[in-house]
Amino acid sequence: MIASGLVFFSLVYSRAERKRTERGRNVMRISSEKISTDQAEFQKKIDEKYMRQAIRQAKKAYELDETPIGCVIVREGKVIGRGYNRRNTDKNPLAHAEITAIRKASRKLGDWRLEECTLYVTLEPCQMCAGAIVQSRVARVVA
C-alpha cells in the first residue's frame, strides 16, 4: 500500500507545477505534457549519474555498519545536499539519509522550500522521509 502510494505520489508530483497566487499561496497544477523519447533518454542518463552519487553515499553508511541508504539533492545540475543513514552512529532516530540531505540543501539555499530540486535516494522513502519530502516541496523524487 505504501509503495503504490509513493509511486503514485512520485508520478503525480513530478509532473506538478507550482505557482504563486496573488495572495502568496502556492498552488499545484498537474501537467499533461508528454516528453519525447529523446528527452526521456536524456533524463534517464542524468538520473543515472546522480543515482550513482546516491549509491556512493549509501556506501558510506555501509562502512559505518549502518543500513546502506544514500541520498543526493540536485538543483539546476548542481548537488546541493547529500546524506546517508547515520541513526546508530549519531544515536538519532531522525538521522535518515533523506532528512540529512534535505537539511543540508535547505541550509545551502537559505530556504526550506526545495521547489526546483530533484531528490535521488537508493531506497523508497519511509513515511517520515516521505512527509519531509512533501513538506520541503521537493519537485521530483527518483528512487
Residues covered by each model-derived region:
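Catalytic cores of nucleic-acid editing and processing enzymes
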Residues: 27-50
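Short, basic/aromatic recognition patches
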Residues: 43, 47-63
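Short beta-strand scaffold segments in enzyme catalytic cores
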Residues: 69-74
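Bacterial Sec-dependent signal peptides at the C-terminal "C-region" and cleavage site
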Residues: 11-17
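Zn2+-dependent cytidine deaminase-like catalytic core
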Residues: 44-45, 52, 81-143
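A cytosolic small-molecule/anion-sensing beta-strand core signal
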Residues: 75-76, 103
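Terminal signal-anchor or tail-anchor transmembrane helices
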Residues: 1-11
